[in-house]
Amino acid sequence: GIIEFRRLLIGNGVNMLGSSIFIIGMSWTVAQIGGPKIYGLIFTAYFLGHLPLLLYGGMVVDRMPRRTVALVADLSQAALVTLAIIALMAGMDEIKTLLVVTFLTGGAGAFSIPAIGALVPDLVEEDLLPQANAMRGVAMTAAWMFGPLIGGVTVGAWGIEVCLLLDVITFLFSG
């Protein structure tokens, strides 16, 4: 019911906060190293991982427990970003590492996004759906408003690895 919806709302808001921190950290890092062409390539990699799996992700969400799908997707993204941190700290190529992790997390997001969206009607009564969806929209907007600020300060002060670590923490929190 409402308590589960609140948990979903907070978890999803925190998850979006982490995603926006990641995007700003990655964007700044890529802009410094590779320039606008690489920046565009990184975003293309995300959607190449995401779009082909989105319909399949929706079918999986319709056939499996939605919470399980969301949890597995969030934990998968946390594991992928953790591997990226390890790779970057080991001195691996930043651009290639970010390309791979962005592609793979895009694929995992193709399961997470439909699962979270489908959970809302499961958790609130039909007459409360408009308010629930509005609250979810406010939480997402707030996350996308504050995340870039946090991401910019973080990447400027401590580098991309700390931005990625914050993203991992938010995936674990939301899961």
Q: In which residue ranges do the predicted regions lie?
A:
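Alpha-helical transmembrane-bundle signature of multi-pass membrane transport and export proteins
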Residues: G1-G175
